[in-house]
Amino acid sequence: MFSRLLCFLSAGVLMAQVAPTDAGGIARAALDRLLSQKYSELSAMLTPQAKAAYSEAALAKMGAEIQSWGAVQSVGDPMVRKIGTASIVAFQVKFATQTITFQFSVTQEGALAVMLHSPVAPVWQHPPYSKPDAFKEREVTVGEGQWRLPGTLTVPVGQGPFPGVVLVHDGGPGDRDESIGAVKVFRDLAEGLASRGVAVLRYEKRTKQYPQAAQAKDYTVEKETLEDAGLALALLRAQPEVKPGRVFLLGYGLGGYVAPRIAEADGKLAGMVVVNANARPLEDVTLDEAKFRKVTGAQMQLLIEQAAKIKKLSQGDEDTAPLLGMSGPYLLDLQGYSPTGLAKLLGVPMLILQGERDYLLGTKDFDVWKTSLAGQKNVTLKSYPALDRVLVAGQGPSTEADERKPGQHVAQDVIDDVATWMNQ
């Protein structure tokens, strides 16, 4: 799935010049190869499992994005922390246009397990529509055991119980705030909605809290998103300030795409909000993303060929080599899935919102939602001509660079529309 945070699965190091136990040195060597576009040397560092997952298409996609940031101006010292037996090594790299944090997970054997990168966001400030005196926050834990996730519950002040909503992430390893550049989509939504009488639960995505989760052989959208969303809904219903029969789901991007599946599994949703979400298959959206990133020639042809192979997958192809960065089990989990078709069968109240300046989707998928669900009395649709991928208002074509401008927030119109719909 498209994302501001691209997750690259990699592992295994063959480097005579770096001691296997030197996690910082191993990570820095990998970073140097990445920045200098020495992809064959980077590939030589991968274990067989990672080589299977770390496709040429993913390398091409990564390289194109990194080159777009301009020349490297400085690389910070490694910051190392332990999670279990793994070492997480982070570097801040200053490019001509922005500063990026790269994170590497290094196993105790000296293997690279995961690599992530994300922009360093400016200091966040409350949006003008947030009323801090009108809500309170507390830390909660979603789930238990191996994949328990830290979260934040934002609750209106006053006499409840209140309607509540769980926020579900886009693709990639998102944090609980759904931080994208300088914009914190979920934090804005949480404070804005809580200021208007709606309790909000947001949490760290599993692949953010546990990067190794994406490497599991049985990794699917069920493991990535659905399981934790279901647990979060149950947790929200159990809160004394929340009215159990008025619990909603808000899915952003990928979260909106799979919202009907979450609703089907839950069976008790008061409604679901779908925001800037594709209605078409992931492989189709990925090709659109490649065009946006100006991938051409042989690289684009490779993506087209892999998308065609995805269309032909069938049960029994679980062991197929990853296509467009997605494993066989992940792709088969979504094979034949139609979010609009399932939504129509469920009959759950829906609010579908789309920023028309979304540089990846535009209104193409919104039109699919609109056409497919035409005549459904339980469905409300609205598009915003001025809003972009992160629901920020602007003019003209939007770009990823827009997301890095400080002081931007989700538009108040979105907050008001969602709160009004949930409180009706």
What are these regions (language model features)?
Residues 122-159:
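N-terminal cap/lid segment of alpha/beta-hydrolase-fold proteins
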Residues 265, 271-345, 375:
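Accessory cap/linker subdomain of secreted extracellular hydrolases
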Residues 218-240:
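Alpha/beta-hydrolase active-site loop
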Residues 167-224, 392-404:
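Cap/lid segment of the alpha/beta-hydrolase catalytic domain
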Residues 359-365:
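Conserved alpha/beta-hydrolase "acid-adjacent" motif
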Residues 346, 352-354:
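Short beta-strand/loop motif that positions the catalytic acidic residue
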Residues 390, 395-424:
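Catalytic active-site module of serine/aspartate enzymes centered on a nucleophile-bearing elbow/loop
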Residues 25, 29-32, 36-87:
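Short solvent-exposed beta->alpha transition segments
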